[in-house]
Amino acid sequence: MWDIFRERGNLVTVFNPREAELTPGTNHIVCEADQLRELSAVVVEIQDVGVRYFNYTKDVMQLMEMLALLGDEAPSLYIVDHLNPSGRVVEGTIPAVAGEMFVPKVAHRHGLTLGELVNLYASETGAKFPIHVISAMATDANRQLMPWTIAPASDIPGLFSSYLYSGGGLWNNTTLTPGIGTARPYEYIGAPFVKPLRPEELPQAHGALLRPCSFTPAAGRYAGERCFGFQIMLVPGEPYHSLLHTLHLMRWFREHYSAFEFEPAFWTKLADPVLEAYLKEEIGFDVVQEHMKLEEQKWIRKAKRYILYDDAPCRMKWFAIPKKCTIFAVQNC
């Protein structure tokens, strides 16, 4: 796309990730309002991963806030849409308390494309500047290439990463690492203070197997230190509720390891008092289960107002056997 604009002579500037494309770290695409003022159009092409706390998605929402402040001087916004690599399945709840900045009021795993998210955010913020969404079906590349052919970010190297990110992204704000700095981010979970585990110790979930393992991150938290924990191995073709399973696992670690802690930013990212109460051992899983079911249904009703394609977001049905701490799921699309 850059080459096309450059050949036509209408490319003014390119806003890239702050660091190298796949460098481990917290990448963002940033710009200043003054850089936007003289432009006639801003074209956004990123691959969203379907979870509300993905950095580049938040950067697009921040861009929209800046365009809104420019008023009549704001350039038009063009979104080159892509399919959601984690599909239309939703997980989680709409933020019930003040959450992270530039995060739309959507479920943790929202089931929308970036174009649909922009459509929603524009409606909720009352955006007046022109917005154009170029359909994900408009080009051969979008129709023929898988949405994860090019890695969206350094910590999202492939398809499995996006399926795990709704829950896995929350580990970043705890004293466990989700395998950042390894070849399998969000599949490996552990820390130096965790003792070697047995599979039967951990809460299990439908759609995934847990394999005890050790790993040494090359970057990020615990870089160069040997960590013990487990690997989440997804079962092909089976639905897996990453967020619910992650909450189960976090509560287990809180009960068994005093060194396991939540950072202040964790609660802002979670943005749900009911889920917070569960992690603090104030309520049981049955309450969380019913709460999440109702919230997912509520989000789907809202999301349907903003979809741009034929298929709509849907939820997976799941139930638990508390004695075994097992979560079963059946996709309901």
Residue ranges of predicted features:
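Conserved anion/nucleotide-ligand pocket segment
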Residues: 98-168
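Glycine-rich, highly charged phosphate/nucleotide-binding loops
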Residues: 21-35
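A short helix->loop->beta-strand "cap" motif at the edges of active sites that frequently abuts
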Residues: 10, 67-76
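Glycine-rich, charge-decorated loop segments at or immediately adjacent to ligand/cofactor-binding or catalytic sites
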Residues: 78-98
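Short, positively charged and aromatic/hydrophobic N-terminal segments
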Residues: 326-327
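Conserved functional hotspot residues or short segments at active or partner-binding sites
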Residues: 190-293
